[in-house]
Design a protein with these regions (language model features):
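Bacterial N-terminal signal peptides
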Residues: 5-16
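Extracellular/secretory pathway-exposed regions associated with glycan biology
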Residues: 21-112, 116-216
Length: 216
């Protein structure tokens, strides 16, 4: 650490530089990583504990989650983190979260996504990698785009935090012809009547769900 600077001063500089990388987004509530209360319309995040010195996202299929959390949006700006996950684990470094969920597109077209994180993250839609922001790094934002048909689509955001103390995780979306805003599953809910649902991909929803009847 350079001499002559306090930790607080260095932290302020780091946060200022990090925020400068992010586009101006409309006001949105700051969220936590999630809560243990189940949200059937939100993102489910499975939490995994990592070995120290992990420098990339793990292969989740080889790990066992220690618990799950739920959230409708990921809007965690650069900050220090020591809270852990109440009700799941007190780990605040060397952990990963694998978020999975669905969202409904009413207006088909080219959608732009922005994923900012400290440390690594990736975005998949319908099992296609849209953004690769992996690795150990201070906050950085990466943009990706994908053409989406109308209907239900699968979304996955994988994230990991390496060494303490700072972290961040922000997912934003720009609908066709619009500016970026925080992605929220609450704004992409399907019609109330499942009979009216359409599917961008015939594998987007579990086939063992008796409430789902596919519309051709």
């Amino acid at each position: 650490m350079p001499t002559g600077y306090t930790l607080a001063a260095l932290c302020c500089v780091a946060l200022s530089l990090a925020r400068a990388q992010l586009p101006t987004l409309p006001d949105a509530p700051i969220t936590t990583f999630g809560v243990t209360v189940v949200d059937p319309f939100g993102l489910r995040g499975d939490i995994y504990l990592l070995r120290p010195e992990t420098n990339r996202l793990p292969k989740f299929e080889k790990l066992k989650p220690v618990g799950a959390i739920y959230t409708s949006a990921l809007n965690i700006p650069p900050r220090d983190f020591s809270d852990g996950f109440p009700g799941v684990t007190d780990r605040f470094e060397w952990f990963a979260i694998d978020y999975n969920g669905y969202f409904y597109v009413s207006n088909p077209g080219i959608y732009r996504f922005l994923l900012a994180s400290d440390d690594g993250s990736m975005l998949y839609i319908d099992d296609k990698r849209v953004i690769d922001n992996d690795g150990i790094h201070p906050i950085q934002a990466v943009e990706g785009r994908i053409t989406l048909s109308g209907g239900i689509h699968r979304i996955r955001i994988s994230y990991f935090q390496g060494p303490k103390v700072f972290l961040a995780l922000i997912l934003a979306v720009a609908r066709p012809g619009e500016n970026f805003r925080i992605f929220s599953t609450n704004e992409f809910r399907p019609p109330r009547n499942p009979a009216d649902w359409k599917y961008g991909d015939p594998t987007n929803l579990p086939t063992n769900d008796p409430a789902v009847k596919r519309k051709k």
